[in-house]
Structures are given as structure tokens and as C-alpha cells.
Amino acid sequence: KDIDFANPANGLSTLIYTSGTTGNPKGVMLTNENILSNIESVRRMFGELEKTRSLNILPWAHIYSQTCELYYNLLYNNSLAICSDKSEFLNELKEVKPEALYLVPRVLELIKDKTQMIDKPVIRSVLPLILSRVFGGNLKFIFSGGAKLNADTKRYYENNGIKICEGYGCTETSPMVSVNHFESPRNVESAGKILDNVRVEIVHGEIQVNGPNIMSGYWNNEKKTDEVLINRNYRKWYKTGDSGRIKDGFLFIDSRIANNYKLSNGKFVNVEELENDIKKYISGPFIVFGENMLYNNIISTTDVDIKVINKNIDGYLKINNNYKITVEEFERFYTPKLSVKRKQLVNYILNNDC
């Protein structure tokens, strides 16, 4: 007897609002097929990861943790513990002893900063053992998503025996597009291999994605939907707004196109590259901005030696000023995935004479 499904494959499964880092949040409509096809694509790469235990710290209101952590582990009968409070995460790692973790770059950076303080020559040789104990002693790999992971942070973990499976995707792609496996073949400098059943093309430098994981559109926002969903060769493609390249089957993410800008002297600034170059001179969170200005500027929570930075970067990238605010002020502009709402933060600085 045929079964009448209450919610068919093309029926709405979830409505997830983007974090609004580049504008107003938009409701992303994802169907059952979108999510299930993405889970199947991940399964083809990793297998069912049977009897894997993990500890949740990320909000399930976002598709990365919802699809990759919640649905995937429920589907394959894995154990999933829920952290009682973010402040207890490190303590509960020792109790749960997870074999897999699903984290965002900011969490990995915070743990790196805590453990790096003990990275002294006399104990450097035992740092892998110390890190292993921090994560409970049974950790096999960490999935990192939600934003691009800093290369230095990735190398820190990899060099100390912890495999980082960095992936790339968007809410609009349900979310996974590519991911690095914890076994060969892998390229830790990349965002991994493109998943089965997902197509990626680079069009004028922009990453565009096609597949059954592409959203049906934005809720009650046909204009924005038409801006990002295009038809090409009888296929629906999603314009990610990210620049990147493909080499040897691996996807490399360069920057968020909307974050880049031109100075008033006509010089183009790749913000993420510049931030990565000067990160070693700044303690704590910060961003760079300077659109339509003569020089770049920094917003940070600490004092910054601008002279030292300018000695070590190209002249046209010169930093003019550091707008110092409190940690509490800066944290107001974090999304739930701990990325920064850049435009809102810059507007706050410029409108409040910080």
C-alpha cells in the first residue's frame, strides 16, 4: 500500500535565518531532499562513522551543526552528548571523552590560545599528549566549519596529532560543499574535496554550486533569491559570494568577496589576507576596515603597535588607526557561529566616536 507522506521530499524541512554578517538576515528555505542529499554525500566520503561519540557546543539553529552533527549522528545511531554550558566545555570534554567534535574556528582558536601558553621548548615534545588530554584522550578528528580556519591554527593542531577536517559550505547549500577527510587523500591547506553529487564551478573568480542540496529560495524575498540563484545550462546554481579556486580536485577558499574593498586611492584590499598577515602583531579579536578611505584601520580590543605592523606590510596597505573597544563591545557583534558582523561593527565605531 502506498504511504502518504506528511512532508514530501520537496517539502520545507527547516527555515534557517542567515547570521546577517553582510546585511539583513534572510530566511533560507531548505527541503527534506536538500538535507538528506547532503547527509548522503557526507556519508559517501566518510562512511557511517559508527559508534562515534561527540560533545555538542554549537547551536542547532544553524545548518552546519544541525545537518552534520544532529541529523547525521541520529541517523547512524551515534552518541551525542550536549554541553551543559559553554564555560564547562573543557571540563566536560574530559568526562565525555569524544571521538569526534564539530566546532567553529573561533572555538579552535580559543583552545589553541589556552594551550599555546604551555608551548615551551622544555615541554614541546609532550604537547601532543597534553592536547590529547585536553580533548578527553579519545579524539580522532575535529570537523571545522562555519568560517575559514586560520592556516596557523590548523597547522598547530595537525602538527600536534589532531586531524582537522575543515569543510566549506553555506546555509544555502544545506551546508556542505567540500570537506577534508581525516585520511588520505587530503590537503590541509584547502577546504577539502568536493562532495559527490555536488558540482562546483569558478565563474569570474566566484564559487558557484549546483546540486540537490541547493535551497529552494529565501522566505518571502524573491528579489534576493533571484540575485543568488541562476539558471545555467538547465541547472540551478547558487552564487556563494566567495572567491576561490579548484586544484587537483581540492577546493581553495580565498576570501569573502563582499568583505574586500577599494581604498580611495584605487588600491584593492583583500581583507582576509591582510588580517592573516598582521594577526601575529595583535592579541585578541580584531577586524580591518577602510572602504573609501585613504588607509586601512583596525578595530580591536587591545593596544596595537601600528608602527611595527606598517614596517612589515606593503606600503599601500598601511594601517592608519586602531579603534580600541572593550571585549564586551566587540562581542556584541558576534554571530552565533562566532564570526563578526563587520558592517554593523564598523558603523558602530564610526557613529560613536570610538
Predicted regions and their residues:
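Conserved pre-ATP/AMP-binding loop-to-beta segment of ANL
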Residues: 2-17, 24, 47-53
